[in-house]
């Protein structure tokens, strides 16, 4: 059987008891290593599990799934995913591939950023569509996320923005030359995300958000050094939140006063926070 095992958000101890039992008895254990990262190394996982873990990069998962699934019709294979197993469509594809091969699969869920973002004190049922922010380049600055944020803003809902990570990526030159040389890992910061959002607004000019829009920056959610910072997009574009992973929440206009009381504690500047809040935030129903 193929087991997709969620690892949670932070370290080796976040795995569930059920998930750990699967890892200990599986014939092979793979760690998906490109849609997200844990805050600890693979070696620390191996020490905790008491067994080797095979790192599965994008190429192996998306084009070499037969290797992962080999023998899973006769023995257990564990595929470990940071957060919750179905946080990325790639993992759905793996289950569908297993189904085509007549291999049973089972999912063992865990906490993901989609639920973990509740650490901000923002009520989860006040969130709208989640969007992703990719690294802008000189020639590629996609703004499709803006339309989804606009829909959330019109409903007064919060928007969770997931930030880009680049792991085992090739430059265009190395790709063109067929050289298997990979760029150093890159992880988008809250400051980069806020800056790109303001750049998008400058281009689209639809007033969906602006320099005075309130947002929450979250870093290393679930970890011992978790950090929250609240401020305007302008303030967050200048904040240093330390090592990855980062996420950002654009505050919805219908934010409740209890949410205000909770997040105000993390404000870059409480006077600026109060001024921005009083310009149009707060539940109206």
UniProtKB/Swiss-Prot annotation:
Keywords: Cytoplasm, Methyltransferase, S-adenosyl-L-methionine, Transferase. S-adenosyl-L-methionine binds at residues 9, 84, 87, 112-113, 163, 221, 246. GO terms for molecular function: diphthine methyl ester synthase activity. GO terms for cellular component: cytoplasm. Its EC number is 2.1.1.314. It is found in: Cytoplasm. Signal peptide: none annotated. It catalyses: 2-[(3S)-amino-3-carboxypropyl]-L-histidyl-[translation elongation factor 2] + 4 S-adenosyl-L-methionine = diphthine methyl ester-[translation elongation factor 2] + 4 S-adenosyl-L-homocysteine + 3 H(+). This is Diphthine methyl ester synthase. It comes from Aspergillus fumigatus (strain ATCC MYA-4609 / CBS 101355 / FGSC A1100 / Af293). The gene is dph5.
